[in-house]
């Protein structure tokens, strides 16, 4: 039989979370962000759960082709725009909208010969200092784009660096408004944290919102808020089973480096999941795990193919017992991915994206 590890994608949870994002921005149209292969879930696996979105936002042409192959005929937005001039022809062919974040992309568009005018989102660098034109250069870029026959419509956008924390969005919002207040075009400012934490403040500038991580059931501002606090449901469950049991005596150690020592008799289960499956190697003793839906802890180091868990809270668990590494157990108990990520010093986004190709995936 196959190794018992499995990633399960929950389509009803995707639909629920998308509706939750929409309820926080009821007057906006929603880009469901499916970059990075839908945050590791698989574009094909999430599509049915997210098909009520007004559009899909992603990074590259290969992902856009996959959406069109699923018979999606609505808007698709390339969040990083076009990388080469030849990409513009594919944008025309696939009816893609694309971001313009630098003058070089305007140069490419000006030189592009097309019968199909492009819809573009002109991006301002309002303070995050990744992509975008600085405020003092933004209006000149807009004027130049507006004069191009290759351009049909210009929308305006920016991206917040601290919508999830105490610094907030005020400074970036002032920078954006100062330059764009009298420019026409739709606006798109809100990411996941913007939608949930600043919905009222941004409502007048939210023709489009761009929820990403919230769609996949993770809190954008954890640990201040949990996914449950925001009414989100887990969309990915990583599960496995116990494939071995050991009875330890006081002083016995576990795993590489003997990093865990039993302080008394202890029964542990060996789980078919390791860092080669995408489980974070930096997780250590105390990382939460569910066994038969009961919360317990990992002990020792994460190995390539295995972890070990304390069976004290589940004395009846043995060979074949269900183990939930994150997500929802078969009985409905939930282990938030954010909690597991926190113990590894990372974020839920990374865990979702890091599930290894060798892990089978099913949808429900």
UniProtKB/Swiss-Prot annotation:
User: Which Gene Ontology BP terms does the record give?
Assistant: D-alanine biosynthetic process
Q: Which cofactor does it need?
A: pyridoxal 5'-phosphate
Under which EC number(s) is this enzyme classified?
5.1.1.1
Q: Tell me the SUPFAM superfamilies matching this sequence.
A: Alanine racemase C-terminal domain-like, PLP-binding barrel
Catalysed reaction(s)?
L-alanine = D-alanine
Associated pathway: Amino-acid biosynthesis; D-alanine biosynthesis; D-alanine from L-alanine: step 1/1
Q: Which residues form the active site?
A: 35 (proton acceptor), 256 (proton acceptor)
List-wise, which residues carry N6-(pyridoxal phosphate)lysine? 35
Q: Got a GO cellular component term for this one?
A: cytosol
Known role: Catalyzes the interconversion of L-alanine and D-alanine. May also act on other amino acids.
**Which protein, by its recorded name, is this?**
Alanine racemase
Q: Specify the species.
A: Polaromonas sp. (strain JS666 / ATCC BAA-500)
């Amino acid at each position: 039989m196959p190794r018992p590890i499995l990633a399960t994608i929950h389509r009803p949870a995707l639909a629920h979370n998308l509706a939750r994002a929409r309820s926080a921005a009821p007057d906006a149209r929603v880009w469901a962000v499916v970059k990075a292969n839908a945050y590791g879930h698989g574009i094909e696996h999430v599509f049915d759960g997210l098909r009520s979105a007004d559009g899909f936002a992603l990074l590259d042409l290969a992902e856009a082709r996959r959406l069109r192959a699923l018979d999606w005929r609505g808007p698709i937005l390339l969040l990083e725009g076009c990388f080469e001039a030849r990409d513009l022809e594919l944008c025309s062919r696939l009816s893609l909208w694309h971001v313009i974040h630098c003058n070089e992309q305007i140069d490419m568009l000006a030189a592009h010969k097309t019968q199909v005018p492009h819809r573009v989102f002109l991006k301002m660098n309002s303070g995050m200092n990744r992509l975008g034109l600085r405020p003092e250069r933004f209006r000149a870029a807009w004027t130049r784009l507006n004069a191009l026959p290759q351009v049909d419509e210009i929308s305006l956008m920016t991206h917040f660096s601290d919508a999830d924390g105490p610094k907030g969005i005020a400074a970036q919002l002032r920078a954006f408004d100062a330059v764009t207040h009298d420019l026409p075009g739709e606006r798109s400012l809100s990411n996941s944290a913007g939608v949930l934490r600043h919905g009222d403040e941004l409502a007048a500038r939210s023709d489009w919102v761009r929820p990403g991580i919230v769609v996949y059931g993770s809190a954008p501002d954890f640990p201040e808020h949990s996914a449950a606090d925001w009414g989100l449901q887990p969309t990915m469950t990583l599960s496995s089973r116990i494939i071995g049991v050991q009875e330890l005596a006081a002083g016995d150690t576990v795993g590489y480096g003997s990093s865990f020592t039993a302080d008394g008799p202890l029964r542990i289960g060996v789980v078919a999941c390791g860092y080669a499956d995408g489980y974070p190697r930096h997780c250590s003793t105390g990382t939460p795990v569910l066994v038969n839906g009961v919360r317990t802890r990992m002990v020792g180091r994460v190995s390539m193919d295995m972890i070990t868990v304390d069976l004290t809270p589940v004395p009846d668990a043995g060979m074949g017992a269900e183990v939930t590494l994150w997500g929802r157990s078969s009985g409905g108990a939930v282990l938030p991915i954010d909690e597991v990520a926190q113990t590894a010093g990372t974020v839920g986004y990374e865990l979702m994206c890091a599930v290894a190709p060798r892990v089978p995936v099913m949808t429900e």
